[in-house]
Amino acid sequence: YFNELAPGYHIVAAGSYMGLALRRENESFPVGKIDQLTMRPMGFVEFVRAVDGNPLADAILAADMDLLANVSEKLERLLKEYLVVGGMPEVVSAFAASHDFIEARRLQQQIIEAYESDFGKHAPARIVERMRLVWKSLPGQLAKENKKFVYGALRPGARARDFEESLQWLMDYGIVHKVPRVSALRAPLTSYEDLSGFKLFCIDTGILGALSGLSPAIVLNGPAVFTEFKGSLTEQYVAQELLLQGKTPAYWSSSSGNAETDFAIDHAGTVLPLEVKAAENLKAKSLRIACEKFKLERCVRTSLAAYRDEGTLVNIPLWEIGQIDKLA
């Protein structure tokens, strides 16, 4: 109607279930008439702006590494807070006003309950229980040393074909994101996707923490959060930041199993492999193997260590990984 009879009006609409709505039979969609934007949870810099103000957030966006090096302890503290609170707007708003981690967890649990109650409202009844199994398995899947999604962990004898539809519904629902394995670190990465392997990440670090029952105290007190659960919360955070920057992350592992990159992204006409390290651990054996094997000129390690450009290898602090395009 508006396009044909009232083209002078510009309409903005928001919805939570666009991916599900388009799955319905006989559902029409005005191709070429709509610009779509994907809203994701708030990233780390948006969280900093909400709870600490504009100056520090602006410095993060500007990738002012000299200035940021002087406040690295504060940034690490804020990063831990973000891992607990996450980026769901209601939770961030409440936390910015109260700095109450218990209240943040309560709101996250409400969001989880709303997600789970909606499974039965939109998805076919025959797959609802399988959707719940996949959803509830996320903390355990990401806590493994090898974070490749394993269908057999869902229930004894589970096979991919039994759960593929339920997994696709969760992806369309927008609360999980699949990061595929690639057989080679060559551009474009989509040409080398290996359909047999993938990692599955949650929509948000805070939601993942609440889903796993992780105590905020474990995250906030000391460096344990970066090593607990095999660094799953840290890797979840990096996945979120990459997605927020419009990246389509993948990961690579060698056929022999002796090397793996946590992520890889298409970058400036080539591929940029990325390794997520716990705390200030700077060993990057797998990353070096990957760079040598595929003759890559640049690779990224992200950790709590300071920014360091060593030519082929650049270390980007975890709290600055959202600015990877400026620093890599």
What do the predicted segments below correspond to?
Residues 1-12:
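Conserved Walker B catalytic segment
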Residues 265-273:
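Active-site beta-strand-loop-beta-strand hairpin of nuclease catalytic cores
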